[in-house]
Regions:
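N-terminal alpha/beta PP-like core and its mobile active-site loop of ThDP/TPP-dependent enzymes
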Residues: 34-239
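Intrinsically disordered, low-complexity segments enriched in serine/proline and basic residues
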Residues: 3-11
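Low-complexity, intrinsically disordered or signal/transmembrane-proximal segments
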Residues: 11, 23-25
Length: 239
């Protein structure tokens, strides 16, 4: 091989190498990190866009970032209650009275346990409620950390959606799923939010995070209506 062609071949290989990198980046785009916005702020923005106007909560250490995000956002009010149970009941009542999603929050440990009664009421009443269960730092999971609770086990029976956020990239789509579930199924959606994730930089995603405000209705068939009418008409005393 002529030595004059070696630099040319090396140049071609380098060009092909960078072309491969560019192609890979096009089909595997990196998420865009918004260094100016935290996950907690992204959470509050998403709630506001879905029509939530108030968060009923008791301030706690793991909820500090969410509390601060509410302060910066002028679309949502932080309603400080004396007990998380009261906050959960208030969120359920607001959802039933207004038709919009209610929202409550509780910090790790007692704050989670106190939400239970109100969330059961919302779930059984068909009230769309989003519960933010802020948790201990994710690096402390499974270490018997102070006031650690297993939110999946704790809220599983009183919710249609119950997951724990783990990464900034996952959070936007996950939170949208939680809100959409509460709206569509008219019940409780619980989102576990580790304290360290709440203060992490937010990430934009390519997939849609829009919520759709559907109003599903159950309509019995004509045959069932006729059967019910005949049953009622064939008896003199109906309770």
């Amino acid at each position: 091989m002529c030595t004059d062609t070696i630099p040319v071949l090396a140049y071609v290989k380098i060009e092909l190498f960078f072309a491969d990198i560019c192609y890979y980046q096009r089909i595997n785009p990196k998420p865009i990190t918004d260094m100016a916005k935290k996950i907690a702020e992204q959470l509050i923005d998403t709630l506001a866009e879905s029509g939530v106007e108030r968060i009923y909560a008791v301030t706690g250490d793991s909820l500090n970032e969410v509390n601060e995000a509410v302060r910066k956002n002028n679309k949502i009010k932080w309603i400080h209650v004396r007990h998380e149970e009261t906050g959960a009941y208030a969120a359920a009542a607001e959802a039933q009275l207004t038709g919009r999603s209610g929202c409550c929050a509780g910090s790790s440990g007692p704050g989670h346990v106190h939400l239970i009664n109100g969330l059961y009421d919302a779930q059984r009443s068909g009230a769309p409620v989003i519960a933010i269960a802020s948790t201990i730092p994710s690096r402390e999971f499974g270490t018997e950390y102070f006031q650690e609770t297993n939110t999946i086990k704790l809220f599983n029976d009183c919710s249609y959606y119950n997951e724990v956020a783990t990464t900034p990239k996952q959070f936007p789509r996950m939170f949208q799923s939680a809100i959409q579930t509460a709206i569509t199924r008219k019940g409780v959606a619980v989102v576990g939010l580790p304290g360290d994730l709440a203060k992490a930089s937010a990430v934009s995603v390519d997939s849609s995070v829009r919520n759709y405000f559907t109003r599903p209705e159950v309509c019995p068939s004509e045959e069932d209506l006729i059967l019910l009418a005949d049953l009622l008409n064939s008896h003199e005393r109906i309770t």
